[in-house]
C-alpha cells in the first residue's frame, strides 16, 4: 500500500538501522500490503482525448455537451437553501448547482454508547431553525457538488454548479432532491441525498433521463465524463495560509483493481522508491497536470478524500466507474473524481447511479452502523447493499495498525479509570510498558554495566591498535567473547519500541480522541509543544522558528543516558555519540508532543533503572571485597 507516512517510517527505521549497524560493525565497544500494479491499469497515462483537453482547455464534441452558463447572470436571491440535521451531521444544501454547500460534523454517540467529541478545536456555532450547534466544517466553505464535467480543467468547478436546480424536501425521510434539465433539453439530471439520523452514512442517487427521441451517448471513450464526489476535506486553518506541514495532512485515496492507493492532495501517487529514482534522473514525477488511473475489469471500488482526523468516501453500490482522476496541480482541491466512459441511454431511459457515502472520523467506531437494519452485513434489505468490504482500508495505517489500535484502547482505558488526562495516560502507559519488558530492559542495563567494567581494557586495545582498525576490532570482539558480553545485546528493547513509536505517531496524528489534549505546559499533545516562536527571518522563513521544549528535554535525557552508559571511546565514537542526539532532535522536532513525551519518559525510566543497577552492582562488589 502506498502509505503517505512511508517516507517518515523508512527514514526512522533507516536512521536507527544505520545507528545500530555503525555501532556493531565499526564501533563494537559502544552500547548499543505489497504495492502491486493493477491489471490493465494505465499508471500516469492520459488518453489522447484527455491530453487535448488539458492543452486546449476545451471540451471535446459529443452528443451531449455540459451546460454552457453565463456565470455573471446568476442571481443569488434565486438560490434556495435547506438544512438536514442528524445525530452527527448538519448539512446545508443549495439549489445553485444542486449541491451540498456546507457540511458540518458535531459530537455524536458511538455504537457502544460512548460520546465521541468532534467539535474539539475552534468549533463554529451553526444555527438551524433557531437551535444552536457546536460543530466543525468539513467542506472548506466550498461544499460537495457531485456534478459532472466533460473537461478535466473544469472538474473543480463544473458548469452544472451555475445551474439552478429545483429543490424538494422530504423532512419525514430526511432527504433532499434536486433536478435540472440540460440547456439543449436533451436530458434531465436528478440527485437525491437520503440521510439516516443515527448513522454517519448517507445515500446519493444520481439519475440521468434521456428526453430526446434518439439514443443519448452521455459518456463514451470519445466523450469521457468526470464526476467530482468529495473535494478536499477540512477542517483547515482559516486564519493563516496552509503551511507545508498542514498540507501533509490532506490526502485522497481510492481502491482500484484490488489495490488501495493514497496520495497527498496536489501530487501524483508516486511511491517512495519512484521518488528516489525521479530525484536522481531529474524527473519531477508529475509531468502532466492530470493523470488517470483505470481498470476496465474491476473498476473503482471506492474513492474519497481525507484530512488529519476525518475521511469522506463515495462507494458506488450498483456500478463500477471506469477509473479515477488525479489532479496534480499544486494546491488543487479537486478531491475524488470518478471517470465514466460507458453510459448510453435509449429514448426515455433512466440511468441510475447509487452511492453509499461516509463522512466521519478515521476510526472503526465512526464507520460502524448503529441500526442493524441499515447494516448491509446484517440485513439484505439495507439501502447500502453493495457496500465494499474493503472500506475500512480508508483509514488503515499499514502493518502497525494493530499496535496503533491496541495503544489507543489502552490509553482510553487509562484515561477512563485513572486520571482523565492523556498526558498522564502516556506516562502510565510508559511505566506499564517498562514493567512488561522489565527482563529485557534489565538485561540491557546489565549489559551496559559489563561494558563499563571492560572500559580500561577497551581503552588499552584502542591505544595499542590505534593505527590498525581491523586488529582493534578483532581484539575487541575477542574481549567481549571472553567476558560473555554481547555488544548489541542492549539494542533489543529499542528494536521492540520501533513499532510502538510508529504506532504512537499514527495514534497522535489522526485519532480524534487525542486532538487538542493538553498536559502541563503542552497545549495539544497531537502537535509539537511550541513555547516560543521567533520573528520572521528574511529569505529563510516567513513564520519564524518555533522552540519546542519537550524535544530539547528528550535530547537532554538521551545525551545523559548515553554518557551514563558510555565506555572508553576513540574520537570517532565520541563524534557518533554527539551526532545521534542531533539526529534524534531532527526526527522529533515536529513530532506530536505526545510521542516525544513518551520517549522522554522512557529515557527517564531507563536512566533510573541503570542507576539502580549500577548502585546494586557497586554494593555487591563492596560486599565481595570485604569477604
From Swiss-Prot:
Predominant location category: membrane
Q: Where exactly are the transmembrane stretches of this chain?
A: 8-28, 417-437, 488-508, 536-556, 575-595
Query: Where is the protein found, in the record's own terms?
Result: Cell inner membrane
Basic and acidic residues compositional bias: what residue ranges? 58-68
Where is region (Disordered) located?
Answer: 33-68
The record gives the membrane topology as: Multi-pass membrane protein
The residue ranges flagged as biased composition, category Polar residues, are 33-57
- Any idea which UniProt keywords this protein has? Cell inner membrane, Cell membrane, Chaperone, Membrane, Protein transport, Transmembrane, Transmembrane helix, Transport
One Pfam family for this entry, by name? 60KD_IMP
Q: Which GO terms describe its biological process?
A: protein insertion into membrane; protein transport
Q: Which InterPro entries match?
A: Membr_insert_YidC, YidC/ALB3/OXA1/COX18, YidC/Oxa/ALB_C, YidC_ALB_C, YidC_periplasmic_sf
Task: Give Gene Ontology CC terms.
Answer: plasma membrane
Q: Give a yes or no for keyword Chaperone in this entry.
A: yes
In its UniProt record, a GO molecular function of this protein is: membrane insertase activity
Q: Which family does it belong to?
A: Belongs to the OXA1/ALB3/YidC family. Type 1 subfamily.
What this protein is reported to do is described as: Required for the insertion and/or proper folding and/or complex formation of integral membrane proteins into the membrane. Involved in integration of membrane proteins that insert both dependently and independently of the Sec translocase complex, as well as at least some lipoproteins. Aids folding of multispanning membrane proteins.
Among HAMAP family, the record links this protein to: YidC_type1 (MF_01810)
The UniProt entry, under NCBIfam families, shows: yidC_oxa1_cterm
Official protein name in the record: Membrane protein insertase YidC
Organism, scientific name: Leptospira interrogans serogroup Icterohaemorrhagiae serovar Lai (strain 56601)
Amino acid at each position: 500500500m502506498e502509505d503517505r507516512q512511508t517516507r517518515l517510517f523508512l527514514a526512522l527505521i533507516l536512521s536507527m538501522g544505520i545507528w545500530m549497524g555503525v555501532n556493531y560493525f565499526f564501533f563494537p565497544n559502544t552500547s548499543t500490503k505489497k504495492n502491486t500494479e493493477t491489471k490493465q491499469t494505465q499508471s500516469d497515462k492520459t488518453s489522447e482525448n484527455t491530453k487535448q483537453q488539458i492543452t486546449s482547455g476545451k471540451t471535446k464534441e459529443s452528443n451531449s455537451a455540459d451546460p454552457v452558463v453565463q456565470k455573471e447572470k446568476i442571481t443569488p436571491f434565486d438560490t434556495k437553501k435547506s438544512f438536514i440535521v442528524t445525530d452527527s451531521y448538519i448539512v446545508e444544501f443549495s439549489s445553485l448547482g444542486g449541491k451540498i454547500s456546507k457540511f458540518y460534523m458535531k459530537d455524536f454517540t458511538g455504537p457502544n454508547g460512548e460520546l465521541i467529541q468532534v467539535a474539539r478545536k475552534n468549533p463554529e456555532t451553526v444555527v438551524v431553525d433557531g437551535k444552536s450547534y457546536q460543530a466543525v466544517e468539513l467542506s472548506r466553505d466550498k461544499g460537495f457538488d457531485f456534478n459532472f464535467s466533460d473537461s478535466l480543467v473544469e472538474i473543480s468547478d463544473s458548469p452544472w454548479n451555475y445551474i439552478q436546480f429545483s429543490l424538494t424536501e422530504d423532512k419525514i425521510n430526511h432527504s433532499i432532491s434536486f433536478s435540472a434539465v440540460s440547456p439543449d433539453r436533451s436530458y434531465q439530471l436528478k440527485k437525491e441525498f437520503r440521510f439516516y439520523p443515527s448513522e454517519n452514512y448517507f445515500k446519493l442517487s444520481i439519475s440521468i433521463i434521456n428526453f430526446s427521441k434518439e439514443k443519448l451517448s452521455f459518456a463514451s471513450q470519445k466523450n469521457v465524463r468526470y464526476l467530482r464526489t468529495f473535494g478536499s476535506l477540512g477542517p483547515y486553518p482559516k486564519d493563516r495560509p496552509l503551511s507545508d506541514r498542514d498540507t501533509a495532512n490532506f490526502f485522497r485515496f481510492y481502491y482500484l483493481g484490488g489495490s488501495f492507493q493514497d496520495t497527498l492532495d496536489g501530487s501524483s501517487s508516486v511511491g517512495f522508491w519512484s521518488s528516489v529514482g525521479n530525484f536522481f534522473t531529474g524527473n519531477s514525477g508529475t509531468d502532466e497536470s492530470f493523470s488517470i488511473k483505470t481498470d476496465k475489469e474491476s473498476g473503482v471500488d471506492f474513492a474519497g478524500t481525507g484530512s488529519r482526523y476525518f475521511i469522506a468516501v463515495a462507494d458506488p453500490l450498483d456500478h463500477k466507474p471506469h477509473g479515477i482522476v488525479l489532479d496534480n496541480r499544486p494546491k488543487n482541491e479537486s478531491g475524488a473524481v470518478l471517470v465514466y466512459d460507458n453510459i448510453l441511454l435509449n429514448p426515455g431511459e433512466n440511468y441510475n447511479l447509487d452511492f453509499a457515502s461516509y463522512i466521519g472520523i478515521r476510526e472503526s467506531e465512526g464507520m460502524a452502523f448503529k441500526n442493524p437494519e441499515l447494516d448491509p452485513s446484517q440485513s439484505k434489505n439495507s439501502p447500502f447493499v453493495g457496500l465494499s468490504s474493503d472500506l475500512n482500508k480508508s483509514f488503515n495505517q499499514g502493518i502497525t495498525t494493530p499496535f496503533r489500535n491496541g495503544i489507543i484502547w489502552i490509553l482510553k482505558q487509562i484515561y477512563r479509570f485513572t486520571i482523565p488526562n492523556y498526558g498522564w495516560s502516556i506516562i502510565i502507559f510508559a511505566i506499564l510498558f517498562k514493567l512488561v519488558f522489565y527482563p529485557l530492559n534489565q538485561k540491557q542495563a546489565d549489559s551496559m554495566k559489563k561494558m563499563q567494567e571492560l572500559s580500561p581494557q577497551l581503552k588499552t586495545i584502542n591505544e595499542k591498535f590505534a593505527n590498525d582498525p581491523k586488529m582493534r576490532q578483532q581484539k575487541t570482539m575477542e574481549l567481549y567473547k571472553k567476558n560473555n558480553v554481547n555488544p548489541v545485546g542492549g539494542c533489543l528493547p529499542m528494536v521492540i519500541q520501533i513499532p510502538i513509536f510508529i504506532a504512537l505517531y499514527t495514534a497522535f496524528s489522526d485519532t480524534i480522541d487525542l486532538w487538542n489534549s493538553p498536559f502541563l505546559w503542552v497545549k495539544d499533545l497531537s502537535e509539537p509543544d511550541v513555547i516560543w516562536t521567533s520573528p520572521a527571518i528574511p529569505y529563510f522563513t516567513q513564520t519564524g522558528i518555533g522552540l519546542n521544549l519537550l524535544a530539547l528535554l528528550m535530547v537532554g535525557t538521551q545525551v545523559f543516558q548515553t554518557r551514563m552508559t558510555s565506555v572508553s571511546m576513540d574520537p570517532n565514537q565520541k563524534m557518533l555519540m554527539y551526532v545521534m542526539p542531533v539526529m534524534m532532535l531532527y526526527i522529533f522536532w515536529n513530532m506530536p508532543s505526545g510521542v516525544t513525551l513518551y520517549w522522554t519518559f522512557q529515557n527517564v525510566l531507563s536512566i533510573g533503572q541503570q542507576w539502580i543497577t549500577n548502585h546494586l552492582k557497586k554494593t555487591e562488589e563492596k560486599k565481595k571485597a570485604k569477604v
